[in-house]
Each structure stands twice: as C-alpha cells, then as structure tokens.
C-alpha cells in the first residue's frame, strides 16, 4: 500500500522508496477525499466520546448509583398522584374568578349606581393611591405575584437543584398554598376584597413555587428508574456495552412515558374533581342568587386547596429524598444562583440559535400568560361569574387540552411532523387567539364578549394552544447541547419567571387608562407578532452544528481542567473537578466509538413530550 505525497509530486511506498510518478488531477482529488473521510471519522469519534461523557455527567447526581434511590413503582405513582392535586383549581382557576367577582361587587357598591351600566364609565376601586378598574386590579395582583416570585427564586431557586432541602421546600409551598386556598372558605363578603387580593397573590406565589420544586424532582426520578440505571451502567462499563445514542434514546423514552402517564392521570383526576364540584354546586344552590353564587365560588377555591393537600400526602411520605448537586467550593445557596446565571449567560453567546429562541421565548411566554389572564377576566364577565357555568367551561377546557396535547404528539409520531413545523402550527393558533381579542377592542359583537365565544375559546385554547406548554419545552431541548441541560434550562426558567410580571403590569396600565378591558390586546398582539419574526431565521440544523462545536470546546476545557487548569468554564455542570466528573470523563473516552452521533429528536421527533404547565 502506498501513500501519495502531494507536495513533492512523488509516490512514497511503505518501505520508504520513492518513484518519479507524477500525480494526476484525479489522484489529487482521490487524496483529498481520503483525507476528508479520515478527518470526518475522527470528528465523529471525538464528538461521540464527548456526547457519552456529557450524558453521564449532566446530572452530577451523587445518588445516581446508590441502590436505596432506585425509583419504585409505589414512589412513581405517588408522584403521579401529587399532580392531580397540584392542578391549580384553587389558585389558578377559582381564586382569580372569586377575586374578580368580589372586586366587581365592591366597585359597584362604591359607585352606588353611577357606573357600570349602559353608557356609564367602568366602576373603579381606590388602591395604592389610584382609582383602578377591576380588570386592572386583577392584572396588577397577577404582576405583583410574579414579581415577588422572581425576587424569591433568585435567592431560594438553587435549593431545587443543590443540597437536600428540595423536598422540604416543596412541603412548605404545598402546605401554605393549600392553606391559603382553603382560606377562601371565609372570604365571601365584597368588603373583604383587599383580603382577597392578598390571598390571590399568595396563591400565585405558592402554586408556582410548588410546581417548580415538584418538577425539580422529575430528572432524579427518571434517572432512578431501573431501565435507565441499567443503561447508564452499560454505558459506563469498560468497554462500553451500549452506545451514547442508545442510552439517550432509552432515557428519553422513559422521560416521555412518565410525563405522558402523569398528564393522563392528572387530567382524569381533575375531571373527576370537577364533576364532584358540579354536584356540590347543585347541592348548595349556587345559581339561586348573587349571594349563593359568591359563596359557591369560595367553596370551589377551598375544595381546590383541600384536594391539593390530600393528593400531596402520598408523595410527602413515599418520596426518596435524593440529594441534589454539591455546591461548588466558595459558594452558598444564595450565591450559587448567580453563578448559574453567569455561566448560562456566558455559554449562550456561543449558541446563536439558542439565544434567538431564548429571546422569542421571553416575548411569547409572557404575552400568552398575560393574554390568558385578560381573556379569563372577560370570560368571568360574560358568564356573570356563575360558578356553575365557569365549572362547566373548565370541564370542556380540560377535555380539550387532553385531546389537543396527545393528539399533536401522536400526529408528530405517526406522520413524522418535525418539532419546528408542529411548533409553527401552535404559534399560528396563538396568533389567531390574539387577533380575535384585538377585534374585540372595536366591537361588542364578538372578540370575547359573548358567552358562546368562550365555549369555542375553551376548545381552541385547550385543543390547539395548550400544546405550547409541551412543545415549547421540547424546542428548548432541541437547541440545548447534551450534558448542559441544567444550565440552559435554568436560564430559560429564570427568563420565564422574570418576564412573567412585565405583561400584567403593562396590560394593567393600559386597561386602567382606557377603561376598556380588551385594550391590552394592542400590546399583546404586537408582542406576539414581534416574537413570530424571530422564528423566521431560527434554524434547528444550524443549532445542531453549533451544539457539536460547543461540545468540542467543552471537551478541550475539560481536558485542561483535568490537567490542573481553571475550573469555572464549560467543564462539568458547574465546573467542579471532583472524582465523579473525572471518572465520567474517563468513561466517556471509551464510550460508543462505532456509531455516528445524531441528535435525539431530529429524525421526525418521536421525543416530543406532551405536558401542560400553568404559568
């Protein structure tokens, strides 16, 4: 066998002999192809090694290989059952409706017949030094709740991922949240509207807090499943008994299975609870008069809190308290959150497509959440705050959500619809939602002003818009490098929470200034269309290339760290050079050298995860 030496124009044999044979253009072309193939093979092997190491080190979970933390069937089912109670009936549905009802009755009483009628101005209540409309007060309370969350999570958010306090923080949020929901039992007088605002703000904070710390248990729960543990052990063996790609596929399938079952059980449980509430409303004669209806709304919110606590108890007693990540040296629970933010911001600039999606997510998530609040205030007015009608609308919405989320997931799975195309369809449905509200600014004939529109809205929102909560997070996974989910998801989580108070505050000001409850759609439609423009240059193929380059740079930094270099870069989850990371790094060097890497979910997207999150 001989190797051509292009520069000298001669052929060199294995024995070192040379000949005067000149290389033809065809020979040069063949040589270039061979060199390219060899380089490509090396790149694939290197990328696969980095990928394997990233998969094993991404959790940085010291409990990953301890037998006592294997996820049992009983523990898994207690996790499912918790979600039945934490569905938001009290803090997310009936609490806001009762707040708006009490505000409306109090404002009408204060106006004494001079407002709220045909041709009259909107009734207002004085709060925080200004006379404000009812819709403005609801949005303001919503914004205050989210603003407090941002401040709170900047200081305690790290407890969800570090140390062993996460389960106890979840218990605290759940107990306080359920208690403040049940406090609605005693708030039935319009004169208590200020107390109602306080309860609503507390409901908002505790519900979102509980949801965050409950969700933080999910990765460890999945990694503890016997199937995932077995696959991880095979990948870490020397030589590896499986490929990194196969391990990623198994973990993804188990993650999707847990989420799907969780959502299905939650939806079925919520429908049963709503059916029970419907019976209670009939028994207490909710439709008899305004006083009975007001009491009924408080009963509904209180039942939501009671079921939340009841269904949380199994998880409190059966959860295996898996320790979280270790704090980096020199950091505590207060300062590590800023480290997370700094590292995530540092890395995001190297991932242009990820940054593009982050800006899009910032705009649309806040806009959609605010729009839902605005539409809910309009729905309450159209339904005349009838607890019975609102409960029936909610049943329709939950059924539609179940059909919509699972329907889109199966369409993707069986027809090979890509994540990006499915995502674009959901965005189109969101735009229609905003346009319909925008029309309502100028006419009372339609645009969320009639009761029939809200039956259609529940079908549309549940079936076509709610998949946003699943597919938007699937998209985050599409633009996140393997092994760095922790940092990137923490950044998206912080952005989601920090942006969530902007929309309510702006919309509250618009509604209060104009006296038109539909006026916020000026702002909401503009933000929606502006965010859609960012989807035009979004390219998932470019994102995969950026991720591969990012992982290659990460490998180089890990090697420098192993040799005693700087420790706070791309290496590890937070740059710690502990024995576990070194062990994983050595494992990754031998893992899966035979198959080229593909990005999970890039082959038609069987990894889309249906999941609903109320924000």
Regions of interest found by a model, annotated:
Residues 421-470:
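C-terminal transmembrane helical hairpin of 12-TM major facilitator-type secondary transporters
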Residues 213-221, 377, 470-479:
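Intracellular helix-loop hinge segments at the cytoplasmic ends of transmembrane helices
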Residues 483-513:
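A late C-terminal transmembrane helix in Major Facilitator Superfamily
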Residues 149-165, 403-424, 441, 511:
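Helix-to-loop junctions at the C-terminal end of transmembrane segments
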Residues 99-101, 157-158, 270-294, 409-414, ...:
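Transmembrane alpha-helix termini and helix-breaking/packing motifs in multi-pass membrane transporters
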Residues 2-75, 185, 195, 209-361, ...:
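Intracellular loop-helix junctions on the cytosolic face of multi-pass helical membrane proteins
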Residues 93-135, 373-391:
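Short amphipathic helix-loop junctions that connect adjacent transmembrane helices
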Residues 171-191, 428-447:
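C-terminal ends and interior cores of transmembrane alpha-helices
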């Amino acid at each position: 066998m001989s190797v051509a030496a292009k520069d000298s124009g001669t052929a060199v044999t294995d024995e070192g002999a040379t000949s005067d044979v000149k290389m033809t253009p065809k020979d040069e072309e063949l040589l270039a192809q061979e060199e390219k193939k060899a380089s490509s093979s090396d790149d694939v092997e290197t990328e696969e090694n980095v990928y394997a190491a990233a998969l094993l080190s991404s959790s940085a979970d010291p409990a990953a290989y301890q037998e006592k933390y294997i996820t049992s069937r009983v523990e898994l089912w207690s996790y499912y059952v918790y979600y039945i109670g934490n569905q938001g009936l009290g803090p997310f549905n009936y609490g806001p409706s009762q707040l708006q009802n009490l505000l409306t009755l109090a404002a009408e009483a204060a106006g004494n017949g001079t407002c709220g009628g045909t041709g009259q101005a909107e009734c207002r209540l004085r709060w925080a030094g200004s006379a404000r409309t009812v819709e403005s007060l609801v949005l303001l309370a919503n914004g205050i709740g989210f603003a407090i969350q941002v401040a709170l999570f900047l200081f305690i958010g790290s407890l969800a991922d570090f140390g062993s306090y996460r389960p106890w923080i979840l218990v605290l949020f759940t107990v306080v949240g359920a208690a403040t929901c049940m406090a609605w039992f005693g708030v039935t007088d319009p004169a208590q509207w200020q107390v109602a605002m306080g309860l609503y703000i507390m409901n908002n904070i505790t519900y979102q807090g509980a949801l965050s710390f409950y969700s933080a248990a999910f990765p460890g729960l999945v990694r503890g499943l016997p199937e995932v543990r077995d696959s991880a052990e095979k990948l870490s063996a020397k030589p590896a008994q499986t490929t990194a790609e196969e391990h990623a596929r198994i973990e993804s399938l188990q993650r999707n299975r847990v989420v799907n079952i969780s959502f299905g059980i939650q939806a079925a449980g919520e429908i049963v609870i709503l059916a029970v509430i419907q019976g209670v409303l009939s028994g207490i004669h909710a439709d008899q008069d305004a006083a009975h209806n007001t009491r009924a709304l408080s009963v509904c919110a209180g039942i939501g809190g009671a079921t939340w606590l009841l269904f949380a108890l199994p998880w409190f007693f059966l959860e295996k308290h898996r320790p979280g990540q270790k704090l980096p040296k020199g950091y505590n629970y207060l300062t590590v959150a800023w480290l997370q933010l700094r590292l995530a911001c540092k890395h995001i600039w190297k991932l242009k497509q990820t940054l593009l999606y982050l800006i899009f997510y910032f705009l649309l998530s806040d806009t959609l959440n605010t729009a839902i609040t605005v539409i809910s205030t309009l729905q309450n007015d159209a339904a005349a705050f009838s607890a019975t009608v609102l409960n029936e609308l909610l049943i329709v919405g939950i059924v539609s959500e179940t059909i919509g989320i699972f329907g889109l997931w199966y369409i993707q799975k069986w027809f090979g619809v890509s994540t990006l195309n499915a995502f674009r369809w959901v965005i189109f449905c969101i735009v229609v939602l905003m346009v319909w509200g925008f029309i309502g600014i100028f006419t009372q004939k339609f645009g969320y002003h009639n009761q029939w529109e809200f039956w259609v809205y529940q079908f549309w929102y549940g079936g076509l818009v709610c998949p946003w909560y699943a597919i938007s997070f699937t998209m985050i996974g599409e633009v996140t490098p393997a092994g760095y989910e922790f940092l990137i998801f923490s950044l998206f989580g912080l952005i989601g929470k920090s942006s969530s108070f902007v929309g309510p505050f702006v919309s509250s000001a618009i509604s209060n200034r104009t006296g038109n409850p539909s006026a916020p759609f000026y702002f909401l439609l503009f933000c929606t269309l502006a965010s859609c423009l960012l989807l035009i240059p979004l390219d998932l193929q470019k994102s995969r290339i950026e991720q591969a380059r990012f992982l290659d740079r990460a490998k180089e930094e890990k090697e420098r760290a192993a040799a005693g270099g700087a420790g706070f870069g791309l290496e590890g989850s937070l740059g710690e050079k502990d024995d576990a990371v070194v062990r994983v790094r050595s494992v990754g060097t031998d893992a899966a050298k035979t198959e080229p890497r593909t990005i999970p979910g890039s082959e038609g997207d069987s990894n889309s995860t249906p999941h609903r999150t109320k924000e």
